[in-house]
């Protein structure tokens, strides 16, 4: 036998070294989370029930444990099921899990700017600025709390003018909540009949409807295919672009009338930052537009839907409404507006508001995260940029923390002596570094709007209370209340 030539020997040595290095790398990385075998291109889509994703995830967690992998189309997703593992990821390893999962639909619209869908330094700077600016001070002459109190008075007067006639409260609540964003971001509220305001509300409502469609969600996992097909995803993109144009107009007007010595609102604060830090490439008109758009899209539908769902639940449970009336009358009375300082003296009312958020479980799947580096979670390796679903529903519905979680019970947030009970499992705003930037604003709105309504009105259903259905309409993204009408009876 001829001896192997030197080039052949060198080639074999190189291949051997490569294989050893690859083996060592794999062994050091460890195994990735288990999961069902995906079908090429399609993934595990047919193994999931789009109308009851939580039940599908529950069954998969029983088989594979609290950390498992699914494939949505060609995209790999690691699902985290249960409080312990979600806390371990989002809080204990917050930096590693601080990325936002890549969503092609919103990438088309936001182009990596704003707060909700951006990543890296852009996200850090926009979030830090928004949190600082939205704090309850330094926003012109009125604090955010005062703006909400003022809007609550307008809402109460508008409800009073219905003269006890039954109506669907959706529009009233959406107008009130949207006006808080308008007041904070644009510097002033709109009259409820203002044509420009009504057009904005219609666009926001349309966005919410189309965003909850299953075809829209599928676009994020099959963008190449759905780009060639008509559907709600294309309507949503056009609708968001229309809101974008609306905001751009207002920003242009602000730039023309801007006075650095007298900032009026969020937009002025941003323009001031742009002028102070001209070398900072993250503070641009485009990023201002997208950040403002974020505040509207994230801050209007979620809060108004929670209020609407809360009123429906109180229609079903008049005994809970009555306890809230008595507590509000005792602490606040009828001669002044409720304020945030009252909350600590209203433990039952506070517990009801927390229970509304827990019970409705508005975003069961949560907004997707991503790991920003190769990460180990328990015994598993998760490669950089992997999309993460840190599920909220199993936490808010945990039967050990909240006995009989399917039942609406303010006692879930009350101690035996009637004081308010905090729970680490209360995560409707998510958790960790990506916790909702508008959490503080939303909490204020929910408390001040609901207490103001109940201070002034009793709720009267249009049908027998036993026929009121408080189970949600489950969409592909959110749980929303069933349509209903209510009469507001002055107290």
Curated annotation (Swiss-Prot):
Gene name, Swiss-Prot/TrEMBL: CYP2H2
Location relative to the cell: Endoplasmic reticulum membrane; Microsome membrane
Documented EC number(s): 1.14.14.1
Reaction catalysed by this enzyme: an organic molecule + reduced [NADPH--hemoprotein reductase] + O2 = an alcohol + oxidized [NADPH--hemoprotein reductase] + H2O + H(+)
Induction: By phenobarbital.
GO MF annotations in UniProt: arachidonate epoxygenase activity; heme binding; iron ion binding; oxidoreductase activity, acting on paired donors, with incorporation or reduction of molecular oxygen, reduced flavin or flavoprotein as one donor, and incorporation of one atom of oxygen
Main location: endoplasmic reticulum
Keywords recorded for this protein, A-Z: Endoplasmic reticulum, Heme, Iron, Membrane, Metal-binding, Microsome, Monooxygenase, Oxidoreductase
Binding site for heme: 436
Organism: Gallus gallus
Entry keyword annotation includes Iron: yes
Protein name: Cytochrome P450 2H2
Function per UniProt: Cytochromes P450 are a group of heme-thiolate monooxygenases. In liver microsomes, this enzyme is involved in an NADPH-dependent electron transport pathway. It oxidizes a variety of structurally unrelated compounds, including steroids, fatty acids, and xenobiotics.
Lineage: Eukaryota, Metazoa, Chordata, Craniata, Vertebrata
One GO BP annotation of this record: xenobiotic metabolic process
């Amino acid at each position: 036998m001829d001896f192997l030539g030197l080039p052949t020997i060198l080639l074999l040595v190189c291949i051997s070294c490569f294989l050893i290095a690859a083996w060592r790398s794999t062994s050091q990385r460890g195994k990735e989370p288990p999961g069902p075998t995906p079908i090429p291109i399609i993934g595990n889509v047919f193994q999931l029930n789009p109308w009851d994703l939580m039940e599908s995830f529950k069954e998969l967690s029983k088989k594979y444990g609290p950390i498992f992998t699914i494939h949505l189309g060609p995209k790999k997703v690691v699902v985290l099921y249960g409080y312990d593992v979600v806390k371990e990821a989002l809080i204990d390893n917050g930096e590693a899990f601080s990325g936002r999962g890549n969503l092609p639909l919103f990438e088309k619209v936001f182009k990596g700017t704003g707060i909700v869908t951006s990543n890296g330094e852009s996200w850090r700077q926009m979030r830090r600025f928004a949190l600082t600016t939205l704090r309850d001070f330094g926003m012109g002459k009125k604090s955010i709390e005062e703006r909400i109190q003022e809007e609550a008075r307008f809402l109460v007067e508008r409800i009073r003018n219905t003269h006890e006639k039954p109506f669907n409260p959706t529009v009233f609540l959406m107008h009130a909540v949207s006006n808080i964003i308008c007041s904070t971001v644009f510097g002033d509220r709109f009259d409820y009949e203002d044509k420009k305001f009504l057009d904005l509300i219609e666009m926001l409502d349309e966005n919410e409807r189309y965003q909850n469609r299953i075809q829209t969600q599928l676009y994020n996992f099959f963008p190449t295919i759905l780009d060639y097909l008509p559907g709600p995803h294309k309507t949503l993109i056009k609708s968001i672009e229309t809101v974008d144009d609306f905001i751009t107009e207002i920003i242009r007007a602000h730039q023309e009338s801007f006075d650095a010595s007298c900032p009026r609102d969020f937009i002025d604060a941003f323009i001031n930052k742009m002028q102070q830090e001209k070398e900072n490439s993250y503070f641009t008109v485009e990023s201002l537009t997208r950040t403002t758009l974020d505040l509207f899209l994230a801050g209007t539908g979620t809060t108004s839907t929670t209020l609407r769902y809360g009123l429906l639940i109180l229609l079903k449970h008049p005994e809970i409404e009555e306890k809230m009336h008595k507590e509000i009358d005792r602490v606040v009375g009828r001669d002044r507006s409720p304020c945030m300082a009252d909350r600590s003296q209203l433990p039952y009312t506070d517990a009801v508001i927390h229970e509304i958020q827990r019970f409705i479980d508005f975003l069961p799947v949560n907004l997707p995260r991503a790991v920003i580096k190769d990460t180990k979670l328990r015994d598993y390796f998760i490669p950089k940029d992997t999309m993460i679903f840190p599920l909220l529903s199993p936490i808010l519905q945990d039967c050990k923390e909240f006995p009989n979680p399917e039942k609406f019970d303010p006692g879930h947030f009350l101690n035996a002596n009637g004081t308010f009970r905090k729970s680490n499992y209360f995560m409707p705003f998510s958790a960790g570094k990506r916790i909702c930037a508008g959490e503080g604003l939303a909490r204020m709105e929910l408390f001040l709007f609901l207490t103001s309504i109940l201070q002034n009105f009793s709720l009267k259903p249009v049908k027998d209370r036993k026929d009121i259905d408080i189970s949600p309409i489950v969409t592909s993204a959110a749980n929303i209340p069933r349509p209903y009408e209510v009469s507001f009876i002055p107290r």
